[in-house]
Amino acid sequence: MLRILTLNEGTIVKKIDELGFESGIIYETIITSLDRLGKPHAATMGALFEKTSDSVLFKIKAYPLSKTGENLLLTPFGVLNVTDPELLVEAALDLCANFDYAESNSIKVPRLSRATAWIEFRVINTSKHDELIEFTCSPVYVGHLEVKPKPYTRAVFALIEAAIHASRIKPYKNMGLIDKASELCESAKKYLEIVEKVAPNSRYASLALKIKEKYL
């Protein structure tokens, strides 16, 4: 049985407001969950927030046979991690085995130790949308670290888009949507060209090479 020590709704809404989450925007995050053996798993997922003045929910979608989908159906608790863009790319490349975890504040599912902010949640509803399961999630705790701002480079944006597009190629192929898979492949290549142009011989270029080797 999971131990739940929740913040009150008003505090949660305030903290999520302070982090800058807005309704109607999909944010790229890393969701951590637990499998049936209690082993943590991390995966990149888009989260769509729905906020009112006194409540907040967010929705994520996963393939039912994906690790995250299976885990949340089995144990309906998880952590939404806000991270450095590089960590998002590593998660999209399935380099999660190298991730370090830290104890969460209210649930047994751990957060990422490198998360700059995190939202611990419970799943309150599931519904089927085409080939995906939509999980409606209710935050139970919100935490964050004090972080220093970083200068912006187009390489970060392009790298994230390339990783997201590339990671979806195989699922679309498996569903027989070859044209869509080809479209994603071409998009990923264009974004990687931006990385190579604005950040050659950098850690971003190294990650771009890993995306090429794994997906393209």
Located regions from the model:
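Basic, polyanion-binding surface patches
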Residues: M1-W118, R122-L216
